[in-house]
Curated annotation (Swiss-Prot):
Listed InterPro entries: Fungal_Meroterpenoid_Isomerase (IPR050977), NTF2-like_dom_sf (IPR032710)
Oxidoreductase as UniProt keyword: yes
Upper lineage: Eukaryota, Fungi, Dikarya, Ascomycota, Pezizomycotina
Keywords: Monooxygenase, Oxidoreductase
Family note: Belongs to the avfA family.
Name of the featured protein: Monooxygenase AgnL5
Known role: Monooxygenase; part of the gene cluster that mediates the biosynthesis of agnestins, dihydroxy-xanthone metabolites. The pathway begins with the assembly and cyclization of atrochrysone thioester by the non-reducing polyketide synthase Agnpks1. The atrochrysone carboxyl ACP thioesterase AgnL7 then breaks the thioester bond and releases the atrochrysone carboxylic acid as the first enzyme-free intermediate.
Pathway field: Secondary metabolite biosynthesis
Gene3D superfamilies assigned: 3.10.450.50
SUPFAM superfamilies: NTF2-like
EC number in record: 1.-.-.-
Length: 161
């Protein structure tokens, strides 16, 4: 039996607000302990991430993308299936160029409906294929995800070209 629609709706609003604020901790606070992130399309070969893995990468991503702006185009909430879908566009600035990403997220709520249990993200694969390696190089050049998230690194932000 799905969680009450109003509980799911409140969780969805908290998720969207954290995303809009580009606040990693607020986002993480809404994830279930057994949370899983799945990057789509699966043909990209990106393995799913546990909550612990997302806790390492998300703060670094948020710290790396500056002047982040999110435009939410469509939200569909299906309380009977304990799910929601969001289509969004985002822009920002990376140390090596612009961040312009179009994506859809598919949310599965926890059994109680008060947390996000699964987040499937369908991202612009052309952007992601370029961004992924550069982000990895940037993290490595600047002391890893924790150092980037904390704003410290090898003498400040090192751009990747």
């Amino acid at each position: 039996m799905p969680a009450p629609a109003e509980v799911q709706a409140a969780t969805l609003q908290r998720f969207l607000a954290a995303w809009q604020k580009w606040d990693a901790q607020e986002w993480l606070d809404g994830f279930a302990d057994d949370f899983t992130q799945i990057t789509l399309p699966l043909s990209l070969g990106i393995p799913s991430r546990s909550r612990a893995e997302v806790e390492q990468v998300l703060p670094a991503l948020v710290a790396t993308v500056k002047s982040y702006q999110l435009t939410i185009r469509t939200v569909v909430h299906d309380p009977e299936r304990n799910k929601a879908a969001v289509y969004a566009l985002s822009t920002g600035t990376l140390p090596w160029g612009p961040w312009e990403l179009e994506y859809s997220v598919f949310i599965t709520f926890s059994e109680a409906g008060d947390q996000v249990a699964v987040l499937e993200e369908m991202m612009d694969s052309a952007f992601l294929q370029e961004f992924g390696p550069k982000f990895g190089q940037y993290l490595q050049a600047n002391g890893g995800p924790r150092a980037v998230a904390a704003g410290v690194g090898a003498g400040g932000a090192t751009a990747v070209h």
